């Protein structure tokens, strides 16, 4: 594996709070998803990779070199921050123009690069308007545009889909996939699994400052499919439904309501099969059923309780 | 890779970019307009005296010009300009966190600080020089000072001293802007608290102030104009003055400025300029 980014026992803490704990990973080229709930340490990891933070312990290397204040490395890095940091009264064009100048382009070349980058994110029409008049989605596009200005080899996109409308999201998905196909390394951070799934099949799972897994997204999907779940079934006769489900030994507990039956199961796939059979028999009408805890948080909790050795 | 991406950071180009960028930022700030107005405000004093004071004991144009130049422009406006104009270029980038865009680009931190400092020096020097020039012209109307080589020489010297003040106070402001979260508060305490107090404390405490060296550069010796004494119920305490030659004062302020600019650059390299900590962090 040709590691573009490599960390060894990387830790970062702020006072008593450990943001990143003993992370050792090797990130290859291509698009890599950095997946974890809010506060997991994704942004901290990215900022360490960009040299904005100094590691409290361990080290991080980009192409074998430490990134902090390293101009050679910084010239090949692009960064789209999660938060909105702008000089509000300047236009999108001017904001990008100065960043292009700082990236080493002469005025003429800088203007051309800015025009190209804004065209790529479809912001040409509003590029001379002050940033203060931009919507959340437009600001997001400007941030993405500035990260692409100098054609970086390694790109860090920190929650880039925040605030984007469906069309813009689709465009950004294509852009990221395209960058990956060009041979660039894109670290795409998100707390939404299906967003990451759209752009890559390689993910780093990060939770509470620890890397839980680095691998293919299919494996994560399998874990989600199999981890214990809470299933809510909407029916007029919840007690009868439960009687039919009672043959499923995986069900550990149930709760009744007038219209809902909530079951906790150790094997959701088996329970889904049973529910399907009830629906197909058609004796008791089931209006809907869904998982009440199909989110990353519950998956991570499950992963921690089952896949992380005690003491880590 | 980009067609004109530099291989290594080019100090000159980075400084130039930082300089022009800081100019465009500073010149459109309300704070700049406010400081421009404040800098020409002292002009109304000689105009007011000329129009309304009819007694034979009124102060001459020369006296008013010296007092305004020393006490308003050099002692008051230079530290104010350093704090309010000097901090626009550095502090606004830090406060709005747009500095993270710069710090993730291959721009020399040294060049960035120097470019910002040069832009501040240019703008603040221009404002100060315009203010002193207008005040000088207004004082000429009052008499006892003329537009001749002596008058222009005196005015130029005060402008020069003001610029040295901008250099010293500006360098300290830049360091505070890069090192602390409250540079204006700390700056006000230092420039208007410590600097003023140290000039009355017996002993050599005043050597630890910029004002001491600025006073040494004035056209007339400080000892001829000031009688620094603290009056108390137990009596008055006269401060003994130790003189510094103008040349030494210029060298001292230049060295102090270089040290503080170096510290500002070091803080930019060393500090972690980002606020969004992890959930639960303090």
PLM feature spans:
Chain A
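C-terminal coupling/interaction segments
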Residues: 267-312
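ABC transporter nucleotide-binding domain
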Residues: 173-266
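Short beta->alpha junction loops/turns
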Residues: 66, 234, 238, 268, ...
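ABC transporter nucleotide-binding domains
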Residues: 2-7, 12-207, 213
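A short linear hydrophobic-aromatic micro-motif
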Residues: 122, 250-255, 285-290
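A generic structural signal for secondary-structure junctions
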Residues: 63, 104, 143, 222-226, ...
């Amino acid at each position: 594996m040709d590691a573009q980014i490599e960390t060894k026992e990387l830790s970062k803490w702020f006072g008593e709070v450990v943001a990143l704990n003993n992370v050792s990973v090797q990130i290859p080229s291509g698009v890599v998803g950095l997946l974890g709930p809010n506060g997991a340490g994704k942004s901290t990891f990215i900022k360490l990779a960009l040299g904005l933070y100094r590691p409290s312990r361990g080290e991080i290397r980009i192409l074998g070199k430490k990134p902090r204040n390293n101009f050679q490395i910084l010239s090949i890095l692009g960064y789209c921050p999660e938060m909105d940091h702008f000089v509000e009264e300047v236009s999108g064009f001017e904001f990008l123009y100065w960043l292009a100048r700082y990236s080493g382009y002469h005025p003429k070349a800088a203007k051309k690069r800015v025009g190209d980058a804004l065209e790529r994110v479809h912001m040409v029409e509003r590029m001379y308007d002050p940033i203060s008049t931009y919507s959340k989605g437009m600001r997001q596009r400007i941030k993405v545009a500035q990260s692409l200005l100098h054609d970086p080899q390694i790109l860090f996109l920190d929650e880039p889909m925040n605030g984007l409308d469906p069309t813009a999201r689709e465009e950004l998905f294509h852009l990221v996939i395209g960058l990956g196909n060009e041979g660039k390394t894109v670290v795409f951070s998100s707390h939404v699994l299906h967003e990451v799934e759209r752009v890559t099949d390689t993910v780093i799972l990060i939770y509470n400052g620890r890397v839980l897994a680095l691998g293919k997204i299919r494996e994560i999907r399998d874990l989600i499919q199999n981890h214990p779940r809470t299933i809510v079934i909407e029916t007029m006769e919840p007690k009868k439904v439960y009687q039919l489900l009672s043959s499923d030994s995986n069900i550990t507990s149930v709760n009744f309501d007038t219209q809902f039956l909530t079951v906790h199961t150790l094997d959701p796939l088996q329970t889904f099969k049973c529910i399907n059979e009830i629906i197909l028999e058609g004796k008791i009408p089931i209006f809907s059923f869904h998982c009440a805890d199909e989110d990353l948080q519950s998956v991570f909790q499950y992963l921690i309780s089952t896949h992380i050795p005690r003491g880590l | 890779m980009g067609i004109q991406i530099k291989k290594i950071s080019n100090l000159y180009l980075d400084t130039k970019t930082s300089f022009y960028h800081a100019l465009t930022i500073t010149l459109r700030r309300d704070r700049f307009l406010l400081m421009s107005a404040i800098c020409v405000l002292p002009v109304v004093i000689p105009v007011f005296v000329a129009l309304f004071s009819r007694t034979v004991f009124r102060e001459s144009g020369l006296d008013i010009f010296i007092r305004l130049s020393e006490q308003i422009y050099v002692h008051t406006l230079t530290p104010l300009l350093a704090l309010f104009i000097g901090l626009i270029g550095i502090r606004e980038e830090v406060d709005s966190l747009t500095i993270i865009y710069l710090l993730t680009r291959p721009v020399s931190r040294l060049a960035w600080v120097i470019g910002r400092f040069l832009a501040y020096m240019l703008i603040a020097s221009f404002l100060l020089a315009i203010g002193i020039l207008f005040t000088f012209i207004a004082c000429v109307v009052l008499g006892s000072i003329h537009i001749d080589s002596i008058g222009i020489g005196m005015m130029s010297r005060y402008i020069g001293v003001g610029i040295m003040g901008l250099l010293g106070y500006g360098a300290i402001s830049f360091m505070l802007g890069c090192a602390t979260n409250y540079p204006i508060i700390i700056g006000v305490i230092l420039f208007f608290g410590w600097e003023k107090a140290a000039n009355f404390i017996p002993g050599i405490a005043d050597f630890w102030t910029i004002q001491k060296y600025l006073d040494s550069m004035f056209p007339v010796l400080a000892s001829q104009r000031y009688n620094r004494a603290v009056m108390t119920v137990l009596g008055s305490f006269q401060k003994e003055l130790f003189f510094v030659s103008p040349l030494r004062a210029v060298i001292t302020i230049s060295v102090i400025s270089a040290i503080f600019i170096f510290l500002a650059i070091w803080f930019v390299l060393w500090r972690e300029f980002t606020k969004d900590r992890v959930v639960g962090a303090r």
